[in-house]
Amino acid sequence: MSCNGCRVLRKGCSENCILRPCIQWIESPEAQGHATVFVAKFFGRAGLMSFISAVPESQCPALFQSLLYEACGRTVNPVNGAVGLLWTGNWNVCQAAVETVLRGGSLKPIPELLNGGGFAGFPSPTSDEASEICTEMLNLRKADDSGDRNIYHHCRFSSSRSRSRSTASPPKRKRLSSEQQPSSELDLSLIPIYPIKTLPFKEDTPSMYSEESVTTVSFQNNNAGDRYVRCGGGGGGATTKLLNLFA
């Protein structure tokens, strides 16, 4: 047999229905249907099923009850919801809204709770200690609202100005007196910035004008066809055999 929740939502129901244990704490079948329709309209059918499937089965009744109270509190007090009604000492308003939904009635926002930006539901200072603390917090907020807002805007605009100054291009530096006066000498930038690496000169290497230069004399041996070179200046010097690589 289909449960009352699946029946009003017109969805298939089975033995493993996750919606059935959520509404068992509600006594009458009509009240179960009214609560299911109200919560499904507020959070959406897909959202309701997503919330229920995300918790264990043992926590489903508490979850559905929390969703029902939040939906009723947010309807009568759109600014603060059920938590705001509990904080301001108007929890009886939320309970009355839940009973109205279970009977099949309709809810609408209460104007007394909307005045003052949603903080008009605070009790008088003569009620109890918790209400006195809430009232003092409200008075402090109202007293410091304009000042805090001015400080906030001042900080925000100051930070934006400083950010714009930091991102802007830096001002041109003033030229030095030496830069302003024209120089009489030409600056052709011929002097290198980095030092030139010099290699040491090998003194043992003979130059072409020294006496130790090699005089190459090519003559062919009649017998072997080899080439020889004569080393040393003048007419003397040793004769060295060269390999005939191009023969």
Swiss-Prot record:
Belongs to the LOB domain-containing protein family. Residues 1-107 form the LOB domain. This is LOB domain-containing protein 38. Residues 157-184 are annotated as: Disordered. It comes from Arabidopsis thaliana (Mouse-ear cress). Expressed in young shoots, roots, stems, leaves and flowers. Residues 157-170 have a biased composition (Low complexity). Coiled coil: none annotated.
